[in-house]
């Protein structure tokens, strides 16, 4: 199972918000932002804070990618 956060980065662009703005607004640690950039697993409570900050749902910020798929 792979997760990617491409939808998060696109949503930030749509909202004219930088990753640093999100980090401050959602109280996200720098190492968690690195995990997001690397498409690594992030704890659900953190994803919940991101969703609440952006007024989004989990599916708006991340997607499950099948192994071997490109994307």
Language-model regions, residue ranges each:
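A short, Lys/Arg-rich alpha-helix, primarily the initiator
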Residues: 1-20
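Short, charged recognition helix plus adjacent turn
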Residues: 2, 11, 62-71
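The alpha-helix within a helix-turn-helix
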Residues: 12, 23, 51
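Residue-level detection of the helix-turn-helix DNA-binding "recognition helix"
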Residues: 13, 27, 38, 66
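Short alpha-helical DNA-recognition segment
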Residues: 16-34
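Residues that mark the N-terminal boundary/hinge immediately upstream of a DNA-recognition element
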Residues: 18, 43-46, 57
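Short, basic-rich loop-to-helix N-cap that marks the start of a DNA-contacting helix
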Residues: 39-52, 70
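Short, charge-rich amphipathic interface segments used for partner binding and complex assembly
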Residues: 48-55, 59-62
């Amino acid at each position: 199972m792979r997760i990617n956060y491409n939808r998060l980065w696109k949503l930030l662009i749509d909202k004219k918000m930088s990753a640093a703005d999100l980090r401050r607004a959602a109280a996200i640690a720098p190492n968690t932002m690195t995990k997001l950039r690397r498409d690594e697993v992030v704890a659900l409570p953190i994803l919940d804070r991101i969703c609440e900050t952006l007024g989004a749902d989990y599916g708006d910020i991340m997607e499950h990618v099948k192994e071997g798929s490109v994307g």
